[in-house]
Amino acid sequence: VSVDCSEYPKPGCTMEYRPVCGSDNITYGNKCNFCNAVVKSNGTLTLSHFGKC
């Protein structure tokens, strides 16, 4: 399972709720929020699965 975060970081994310679970066991509201966190983590954060943790 993976997400393409090559277009990130983005300055703002929509409020669309399509949760993804990160390897840090945090539920991110959508791909944009998750990808911004991936960039901030220098790539150490990965996708655990789609849906809530």
From Swiss-Prot:
Q: Name one GO cellular component term.
A: extracellular region
**Which intervals hold domain Kazal-like?**
3-53
Q: Where in the cell is it found?
A: Secreted
Keyword terms of this UniProt record: Disulfide bond, Glycoprotein, Protease inhibitor, Repeat, Secreted, Serine protease inhibitor
Q: Name one GO molecular function term.
A: serine-type endopeptidase inhibitor activity
Would you list which residues are glycosylated? 42
Q: Where is this site: Reactive bond 3?
A: 15-16
Cystine pairings recorded for this chain: 5-35, 13-32, 21-53
Supply the InterPro entries for this chain: Bifunctional_prot_inhibitor, Kazal_dom, Kazal_dom_sf, Prot_inh_Kazal-m
Keyword Secreted in annotation: yes
| Transmembrane segment boundaries | none
Keyword Cytoplasm in annotation: no
The domain comment in this protein's record states: Avian ovomucoid consists of three homologous, tandem Kazal family inhibitory domains.
Q: What is this protein called?
A: Ovomucoid
Task: Provide the species name.
Answer: Peliperdix coqui
